[in-house]
A protein has these predicted regions:
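Short, small-residue-biased leader/transition segments that mark boundaries at the very start
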Residues: 3-5
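Transmembrane beta-barrel wall of Gram-negative outer-membrane proteins
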Residues: 8-123, 175-204
Length: 262
């Protein structure tokens, strides 16, 4: 059975600029927007016991079980874990740059620049079990199911959320957000009829990289069968409160004096 999962990448952009005051003050603005839709998981559940999941995009869980889990969570906790296959996610991005140049006079020129970027990447649930070992959490076991006339037999240790034995709901995915903002300025001045030159620069940047997820906050839950994860739902284990922020401020002053050649 084939599935059609949508992928879409459109980029829109515009630039404009010109003089605010003739020969004195100028501006320039550039902007881009990316309308991105990223395909979700291509893995699908089985429709019946006995169906093979040894290859391709078929995983062990039954479609009826995944539907029952979702129905139970909606009814019992009013929590929608999302879809388990056949979905896409929106991952928009944008970039903005603005610049102003001021020719104060023939010896002084000033410029300011502003930059802002935003990206958002979709990721499947982490397979990490840190600080515990996956073999301790998922001990493996023996399956009595028969496929193509042969018993499945032993399931190895450590078969977690991303193995062929499991499926995760879409709200267990997480987004890595990257926001970057910078402001910079420059003052270039000449003195003594050009014999002296001074360049003063400053820059401030702020990088914010939080994680986010769809749906409300809900505990991470792994349902095991035969010692291996069968279904996973709830917020990604390492996403809530996970962020990285960096602020940098720099200022430099360069002075040059041309004393001539003796």
């Amino acid at each position: 059975r084939q599935m059609c999962i949508r992928d879409r990448y459109y980029t829109y952009g515009a630039s404009f600029g010109g003089p605010i005051i003739k020969d004195k003050l100028f501006f320039f603005v550039n902007g881009e927007y990316e309308d991105n839709v990223t395909a979700g998981s291509s893995y699908r559940p089985r429709t019946a016991l006995g169906e093979s999941y040894s290859g391709g995009n078929v995983h062990r869980p039954l479609q009826s079980d995944m539907d029952d889990i979702r129905s139970f969570l909606l009814k019992k906790y009013d929590f929608d874990p999302g879809k388990y296959n056949g979905y896409s996610t929106d991952t928009p991005a944008y970039r903005i740059m603005a610049r102003v140049d001021w020719n104060a006079n023939q010896d002084n020129k000033v410029s300011f620049r502003f930059t802002r970027t935003h990206t958002k990447d979709s990721n499947f649930p982490t397979s990490s079990t840190n600080p515990l070992y996956s073999s301790d959490l998922y001990p493996g076991g023996k399956s009595n199911e028969v496929i193509d006339g042969k018993p499945v037999g032993d399931i190895a240790k450590g078969q977690g959320r991303t193995s062929k034995y499991a499926l995760s709901f879409s709200n267990s995915n997480y987004y890595q957000v990257r926001d970057f903002t910078s402001v910079a300025g420059e003052w270039n001045s000449r003195m003594a009829q050009g014999a002296m030159n001074n360049m003063l620069r400053f820059a401030y940047s702020y990088q914010d990289e939080p994680r986010s997820f769809d749906g409300p906050l809900f505990p991470t839950v792994d349902i095991l069968q035969d010692g291996a994860v069968y279904a996973n739902f709830g917020a990604d284990l390492f996403t809530a409160g996970n962020l990285r922020q960096t602020k940098v401020f720099t200022i430099t002053d360069e002075f040059n004096w041309n004393v001539g050649i003796n």
